[in-house]
UniProtKB/Swiss-Prot annotation:
It comes from Mycobacterium tuberculosis (strain ATCC 25618 / H37Rv). This is Glycogen synthase. It comes from the Bacteria. Pathway: Glycan biosynthesis; glycogen biosynthesis. Disruption phenotype: Inactivation of Rv3032 affects the production of both glycogen (two-fold reduction) and 6-O-methylglucosyl lipopolysaccharides (MGLP), but not that of capsular alpha-D-glucan. Cells lacking this gene are not affected in their multiplication or persistence in the BALB/c mouse infection model. They also show a slightly slower growth than that of wild-type at 37 degrees Celsius and a completely abolished growth at 39 degrees Celsius. Moreover, in contrast to wild-type, they are exceptionally sensitive to the TreS inhibitor validamycin A; the sensitivity is abolished by overexpression of TreS.
Length: 414
């Protein structure tokens, strides 16, 4: 099949797990013989005169990175304007698709959108080429904000999500919990939803057994620095852990809008010197940290899947996670990791303590987690299942959509 993948993240532009997901899915589909074109973007803030649109084949995938138009929008301050400008640049690039190295046009059999930020280009291109549109919903605005859609920007994002979901001919989620979430938020009358878990290339994350600890315990968080990730709970748990395990440290790897606030939280809990913010790490640096850490701590309040949990499991790092959403499906409590309820600082501290107090049991769980990856989270399996969704998707007749009322507490059970 000829697949047009539309994503606001694709290497080297990677913000979080979405970019890694699209990369691995695209390369796995290409390896299976499909003709894959990824439509993405140049890095934010780049000048089109020095960073023009590019069209290259990497790992068997044709990647078109649309240049950023010369505007003054920033993602942090002008998110919706920035997103619309990005979408406009993507549409222009998508309308000019030619078969690589020729003047012949290239026409997709399906358009695959990844999240609301590419709703406008994906919907426009699927309509232009008159082909089915499949959308993977990686997260929702209501989910990220504990069930609430409050404020102008959140309402705008939620409305675009609703539009994307209702324009889709087929939908994919990476966990059963996300299936339930988008059905509750946007149903009834949606296209068929298929749950396809994330995968992992375990060979890139070699397993390393923990060596007997000779010094203070080292904990590791990896991910975006956003409120819904619950990093502040790990910081709040650190003083409790240092009372029973003196010298315990927490390394925080990642970037995000809440870094300054998290530093304030570490100062508030008097663990700033025991907390290390290392920013974004390359693969080699991250792997070294995973191999050294006594536990990977992922205390999310909201997590549609949790790709970092798979990466830590592959590397052999004992897992301590919340049992929310996709994390509750990716980690089997007591078998492949230790889980606790989200927002439960005392429970999180107790879960980490159980890992530190019984390293042999932690190693048994780590080995079981690695073994499970090979059977349940293989990218070729993910690609095969995704291709089946493409084949089954049929472009439906479009009708004008009414503006739906937005319920402020959209997920009342959160």
């Amino acid at each position: 099949m000829r697949i047009l993948m539309v994503s606001w993240e694709y290497p080297p532009v990677v913000i979080g797990g979405l970019g890694r997901h699209v990369h691995h899915l695209s390369t796995a589909l290409a390896a299976a013989g499909h003709d894959v074109v990824v439509l993405s973007r140049c890095p934010s803030g780049t000048d089109p005169s020095t960073h023009p649109s590019s069209d290259e084949v990497t790992e068997g995938v044709r990647v078109i990175a649309a240049a950023q138009d010369p505007h003054e929008f920033t993602f942090g301050n002008d998110m919706m304007a920035w997103t619309l400008a990005m979408g406009h640049a993507m549409i222009r690039a998508g309308l000019r698709l030619k078969k690589l190295g020729t003047d012949r046009s290239w026409r997709p059999d399906v358009v695959h959108a990844h999240d609301w930020l590419v709703a406008h280009p994906a919907i426009a291109l699927a309509q232009f080429y008159d082909v089915p549109m499949v959308s993977t919903i990686h997260a929702t605005e209501a989910g990220r904000h504990s069930g609430w859609v409050s404020g102008a920007l959140s309402r705008q994002v939620h409305a675009v999500e609703s539009w994307l979901v209702r324009e889709s001919d087929s939908l994919i989620t990476c966990s059963a919990s996300m299936n339930d979430e988008i059905t509750e938020l946007f149903g009834p009358g949606l296209a068929e939803i298929t749950v396809i878990r994330n995968g992992i290339d375990a060979a890139r994350w070699p397993f390393a057994a923990r060596r007997p600890r000779t010094g203070p315990a080292e904990l590791l968080y990896v991910g975006r620095l956003e409120y819904e990730k619950g990093v502040h709970d790990a910081i709040a748990a650190l003083p409790r852990l240092r009372r029973t395990h003196p010298g315990t440290t927490l390394t925080i790897a990642g970037e995000g809008t809440q870094q300054d606030w998290l530093i304030d939280q570490a100062r508030k809990h008097r663990v700033l010197r025991a907390t290390r913010f290392v920013g974004h790490l390359d693969h080699t640096e991250l792997l070294a940290l995973l191999h050294r850490a006594d536990a990977a701590v992922l205390p999310s309040h909201y997590e549609p899947f949790g790709l970092v949990a798979l990466e830590a499991a592959a590397a052999g790092t004992p897992l301590v996670t919340s049992n929310i959403g996709g994390l509750g499906e990716a980690v089997i409590n007591g078998q492949t990791g230790v889980s606790c309820a989200p927002r439960d600082v005392a429970g999180l501290a107790a879960a980490v303590r159980s890992v530190l107090d019984d390293p042999a049991a932690a190693q048994r769980r780590a080995r079981a987690a690695r073994q499970r990856l090979t059977s349940d989270f293989d990218w070729q399996t993910v690609a095969t299942a995704t291709a089946q969704v493409y084949l089954a998707a049929k472009r439906g007749e479009r009708q004008p959509q009414p503006r739906l009322p937005i319920v402020e507490h959209a997920l009342p059970d959160r």
